[in-house]
A protein has these predicted regions:
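Alpha-helical structural context detector biased toward long hydrophobic helices
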Residues: 1-203
Length: 203
């Protein structure tokens, strides 16, 4: 929507077919459907997969061209492989939900429709470290291989005369519950948008 999730490695024909529901501005007259959320989730994970693949190639180039130690390069690639597997699994789940959406597949933790067009468009995943009260959401120092970093999806969609601001998570992600409650308890819309703006430019 307005270039928010433009992913130039996907062919235009595929993009228009696979993601046609969520990329149609007319579908934002109401709260987005589960199918639309699944399509957003799919594209977010495709972007994450592409980023990790490019980073792996970059580490090889750094080793070959500027003499970065092989141990360091391999360690970075090993971490990337873990992320890649998680993003691929998340993409597969999102694709399944897009084809057969069920109520409750996703939870919209925050939604606002603004009566004006915001000057920025964004679509992607963010892994918050703390909530608004300093409680840990994602422990980035946890060394347990079974521990997973959990993302939320943030969408800022400027439309023709309005804007959609939305954050949502998969049904199996319960780490953001307190954060969403804290955000909605803030005094007014401007405070909520200020927090979202801070998150956008901090992560």
């Amino acid at each position: 929507v307005n270039e928010a999730g433009t992913f130039h490695l996907i062919c235009r024909d595929c993009d228009s077919k696979v993601f046609q529901d969520y990329e149609n501005p007319d579908n934002y007259k109401d709260i987005p459907s589960i199918k639309m959320l699944a399509q957003i989730d799919m594209k977010n994970n495709l972007k994450n997969i592409s980023k990790r693949l490019m980073e792996k190639e970059m580490y090889d180039i750094m080793r070959e061209r500027i003499g970065v130690r092989e141990e360091w390069s391999q360690a970075k690639k090993d971490v990337n492989d873990l992320d890649l597997n998680e993003f691929k699994e998340a993409y597969a789940r999102a694709k399944k939900r897009s084809l057969k959406p069920f109520s409750g597949d996703y939870y919209i933790g925050y939604y606002a429709k603004l009566p004006y067009v915001v000057p920025v468009a964004f679509q992607g995943t963010i892994a918050l470290i703390f909530d608004l009260e300093g409680n840990v959401i994602n422990n980035v120092y946890n060394q347990d291989p079974k521990y997973k970093i959990m993302n939320m999806s943030l969408c800022i969609f400027p439309l023709k005369t309005t804007s959609i601001i939305m954050m949502f998570v998969s049904k199996d992600n319960n780490r953001y519950g307190r954060f969403f409650k804290q955000l909605k308890k803030l005094g007014n819309l401007n405070e909520q948008l200020s927090v979202i703006n801070y998150i956008l430019f901090s992560y």
